[in-house]
Amino acid sequence: MAEIGGKNMRKILSLLLALLLSACPAIAEEEEEWTLEDMLADLDAELVADIFINAEEAQSILEAQAEKSIYEADGSVLITITGTGDFTVGGDTRKSSNIWDTELKKHKGDYQFAMKNIRDILLADDLTIVNFEGTLTESTYVPSSKKNNQFLFSAPPEYVSMLTENGVEAVSLENNHVMDHGEDAYIETQTHLSNAGVVWSGGGEIGVIEVKGIQIAMLSYLCIDRYDQLWDTVPANIQAAKELYPIVIVNFHWGNELMYYPTDNQIKMGRLAVDSGADLVLGHHSHRIQPIEQYKGVYICYSLGNFCFAGNSKPSDMTSYLFQTRFRVRGEGEEQQITNEGFIIIPIRISSRADKNDFIPTVLTKESTIDSILNTLKENGRKHCEYAVDEYPLAWPATK
């Protein structure tokens, strides 16, 4: 079989495309059915033979090129992962109107508005993980344990596309709002996520997502008032996951609200997770940013603050950040080696406006505001975290 060189292959594919495009007006004017053979009828017989005889080989070449594209120049696989803070959209079914609906009307019912300023960042990475703090349900049922809660969060099931359309591939379902409408609504939320292809972990379930051929495991835990139950459970679960998957990420919902530094239990649990085999720890709940530690080479983000947060029309602090890290994978099987390539943070405000929360997370550009975020992280790291990172890079080094 004759070989098709790169230029010849491009020529053939370009020719096919040109033929298809040129046929469009004729197809529109005449309602008769056109076939590929019709379009190739006037071509040189040898060229036509090349096209059909080498179709299988061409497909193999294209598949090989697609597979090759996941590899770096040195043959390794580089995986970029983004972690965000609390994702809370929709409203409270007990109320006739809510702050989310008010903003939604301004955008003519297009609920994708909230992600418009951050979408490109999340689409550009390989995996984005958010803390999904709420439910995907139309249920109005409120458990007796929740009747006195100030906030109950739910969003219509179709809002799952806010994740899939904007580069969010995985969510944690361990927090104090996933049960706002009871067990049935919690299971319904899991179902909507799974049907949409969004990986989730929670309720004792591990989430597994494959990225560039590498399987990544995700575990999630609600620690508030549960530490005594978790000191033995968490390390056992992480160790079991690490035996099966090369990269293990652990989400914790923990700590105190409105605090800029971790509690002793957060620190103890975060380091225990690393000692047990976790490759990355992401924390939530405080609605405020907290420092990052690098413990035994593993990053522990104690709190990523808020992200897309419709729980407050004007939080006293609307600054936050996206955490982004990279893993490099070399080799396969027993020879496989995984190294962390560092991290950056992307400072954001959870609103596109400074005077109120419009639920549109937006990358910050004002230097003084960015400096304030960096100073908050560094100062609280020095005071409260033995292994706090010294610097918070804002951009990846330029590719050589």
Predicted features and spans:
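Short, Lys/Arg-enriched N-terminal segments with co-localized hydrophobic residues
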Residues: 1-8
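Polar low-complexity intrinsically disordered regions enriched in Ser/Thr and small residues
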Residues: 8-9, 384
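Sec-dependent N-terminal signal peptides of Gram-positive bacterial secreted proteins and lipoproteins
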Residues: 9-29
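Acidic, metal/ion-coordinating pockets
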Residues: 29-400
